[in-house]
Amino acid sequence: MEEKYNRNRIYIKPDEQEKIKHFRVLLGGAGIGSIIAECALRMGFETITIIDGDKVEESNLNRQNYRLEDIGNYKAESLAKRLLSINPRANIRVINEFVTHDNVEKLIERHDIAINALDFKSDIPFVFDKICSEKNITVLHPYNFGWAGFLAVVDPDGKPLQGLSGKPLGFELKVAEYVLGYQAFWMQPQEWLEKVVKQYQREDVTLPPPQLSVASWITAGLCTHAMFNIATGKDVKKFPKFYLSSLLL
């Protein structure tokens, strides 16, 4: 095992370390994806494609993997620069484009797993999942619930996340409502999240959901662990089941 991964020993076998090194990760969206990318890289995922046409804004700095000096620069480029400063030998591919109907199929090709961290401003996140399913690619859906990290793993042959709502506007809220209903059914109500959802529902529907750095890092850990399990043939929970992690649970 390479020296930089020496502390992974016991948890990760040498052959598993080699597998994840070449496991091709597609990162659709470099918001919460920016935290996931670094967590994955540090564990040994060295083949990552970053797709995002957005640029860094000051409001991103409370929860995303950027610095003041990155403001105004492309997120994908800034993130790649940071990742390569950690591991210069990593295979980091940068695409400074938004995912569209015209390019989505080409972008998804030749990857082993996809992270759908795209903004729900159009139906593109749904199209992204559909094409991944057609290409037999598992999709990870990470969400930032402030004090809690959420991850849904969508199997190519399983139930699509789009089943929660066919409308992109307010989709994050639908996911939160689904979590609340699921937890209540299993006698694990999340009153803190209910309060957040009710307050957010009173805001302008066009406002993005509030998010904290806490959940960004929790979710990054969930995603990286799930990718490791998938890459090495271990089990993961598939949607409609999900992962939810917080001190408040």
Label the model's feature ranges.
Residues 47-87:
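Glycine-rich phosphate-binding loop and adjoining beta1-alpha1-beta2 segment
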Residues 107-109:
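A short, aliphatic-rich alpha-helical micro-motif
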Residues 1-11, 229-249:
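Phosphate-binding loop/pocket of nucleotide- and phosphate-handling active sites
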Residues 211-231:
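Mid-domain beta-loop-alpha active-site segment that forms a flexible
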Residues 113-214, 248:
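E1/E1-like adenylate-forming module used to activate ubiquitin-like modifiers
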Residues 32-33:
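Hydrophobic/small residue at the entry helix of a nucleotide-binding pocket
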Residues 96-104:
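Conserved SAM/SAH-binding loop
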Residues 1-26, 58:
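N-terminal charged helix/coil linker that caps or initiates catalytic domains
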